């Protein structure tokens, strides 16, 4: 691997166990991280605003809940596990004014720091600890004595605590050292994560799926078959890729499927490459971040419109019917 990678044997869990951790937010990541930390014998409190719907849940799970500014004053490490677009507002009002030299502020994504939405005072550490998976998977893997890959990065050193040692120890407490903790930078994590979401995992994949579905529908094929071939079977392929890689996927599909993929890969790739380069450029030069923060300031008009429109599409309507048996089994 090109990146430095650390495992449990390389990391001192005692570093994070000696500190008081405060987690701001109790969504999927906040809950999973807090539970994993507590099970790793780490002292952790939760910071939420008065009236937050998450307060009863956090208290029911045995955590002490404080207002954010109180949490900051009583913590050595403060983890900001909030949506990216809320970091500037919350940290400028409730966190930064109460920070002291030697404390560390942690993030699960580099967006707000890399794009200068959050600038921490000198002497306050800035670390990134990013589990490569959703909160549900982070918790499930920990309970199975396994873990997810984690990324760490150091943007600013603390005047009191070694920021890298704290980041590594935090990742170990969440189970990351069981799989591997890779060291990167805020810039690399942020830009590659945004690119992956936009060009492949969310934007690119959804675009190809919906385009494939609509192509078959317009050609007169039944909606059910279009859904099976363009949506339903994506999981089968994704699982093969996840566990066996591209070569392993090739070995598990038919010769017909493999030949068809190879034959059409180049023309499709040529079309996608230029678009992907444009996507990456807009991420790198900050124009995507600017557009996203403007969307937030206007109360998400485009997101709300798109979400409403998606419910009315054929792909969602037939999908809801075909997914019903799977959801019923849960």
Swiss-Prot record:
The keyword Amino-acid biosynthesis applies. Its cofactor is Mg(2+). One of its GO terms (cellular component) is cytosol. It comes from the Bacteria. Its EC number is 1.1.1.86. Pathway: Amino-acid biosynthesis; L-isoleucine biosynthesis; L-isoleucine from 2-oxobutanoate: step 2/4; Amino-acid biosynthesis; L-valine biosynthesis; L-valine from pyruvate: step 2/4. NADP(+) binds at residues 26-29, 52, 54, 135. Mg(2+) 1 binds at residues 193, 197. The keyword Endoplasmic reticulum does not apply. It catalyses: (2R)-2,3-dihydroxy-3-methylbutanoate + NADP(+) = (2S)-2-acetolactate + NADPH + H(+); (2R,3R)-2,3-dihydroxy-3-methylpentanoate + NADP(+) = (S)-2-ethyl-2-hydroxy-3-oxobutanoate + NADPH + H(+). Involved in the biosynthesis of branched-chain amino acids (BCAA). Catalyzes an alkyl-migration followed by a ketol-acid reduction of (S)-2-acetolactate (S2AL) to yield (R)-2,3-dihydroxy-isovalerate. In the isomerase reaction, S2AL is rearranged via a Mg-dependent methyl migration to produce 3-hydroxy-3-methyl-2-ketobutyrate (HMKB). In the reductase reaction, this 2-ketoacid undergoes a metal-dependent reduction by NADPH to yield (R)-2,3-dihydroxy-isovalerate. Belongs to the ketol-acid reductoisomerase family. NCBIfam families: ilvC, PRK05479.1. This is Ketol-acid reductoisomerase (NADP(+)). It comes from Helicobacter pylori (strain Shi470). The gene is ilvC.
């Amino acid at each position: 691997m090109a990146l430095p990678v650390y495992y449990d044997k390389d990391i001192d869990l005692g570093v994070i166990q000696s500190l008081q951790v405060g987690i701001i937010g109790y969504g999927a990541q906040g809950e999973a991280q807090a539970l994993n930390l507590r099970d790793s014998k780490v002292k952790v409190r939760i910071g939420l605003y008065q009236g937050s719907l998450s307060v009863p849940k956090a208290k029911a799970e045995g955590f002490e809940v404080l207002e954010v500014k109180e949490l900051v004053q009583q913590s050595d490490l403060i983890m900001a596990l909030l949506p990216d677009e809320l970091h500037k507002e919350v940290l400028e009002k409730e966190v930064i004014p109460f920070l002291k030299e030697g404390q560390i502020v942690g993030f699960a994504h580099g967006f707000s720091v890399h794009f200068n939405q959050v600038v921490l005072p000198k002497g306050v550490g800035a670390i990134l600890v990013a589990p490569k998976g959703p909160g549900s998977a982070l918790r499930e893997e920990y309970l199975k004595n396994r873990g997810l890959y984690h990324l760490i990065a150091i943007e600013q050193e603390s005047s009191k605590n070694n920021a890298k040692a704290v980041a590594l120890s935090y990742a170990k407490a969440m189970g990351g050292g069981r799989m591997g903790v890779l060291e990167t930078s805020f810039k690399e994590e942020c830009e590659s994560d945004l690119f992956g979401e936009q060009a492949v995992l969310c934007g690119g994949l959804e675009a190809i799926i919906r385009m494939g579905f609509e192509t078959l529908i317009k050609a007169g094929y039944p909606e059910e078959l279009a859904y099976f071939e363009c949506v339903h079977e994506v999981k089968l392929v994704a699982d093969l890729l996840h566990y066996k890689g591209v070569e392993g996927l090739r070995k598990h599909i038919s010769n017909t499927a493999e030949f068809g993929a190879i034959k059409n890969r180049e023309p499709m790739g040529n079309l996608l490459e230029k678009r992907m380069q444009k996507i990456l450029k807009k991420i790198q030069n900050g124009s995507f971040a600017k557009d996203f923060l403007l969307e937030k300031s206007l109360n998400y008009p485009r997101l709300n419109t798109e979400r409403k429109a998606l419910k009315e599409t054929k792909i969602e309507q037939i999908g809801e019917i075909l997914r019903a048996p799977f959801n019923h089994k849960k």
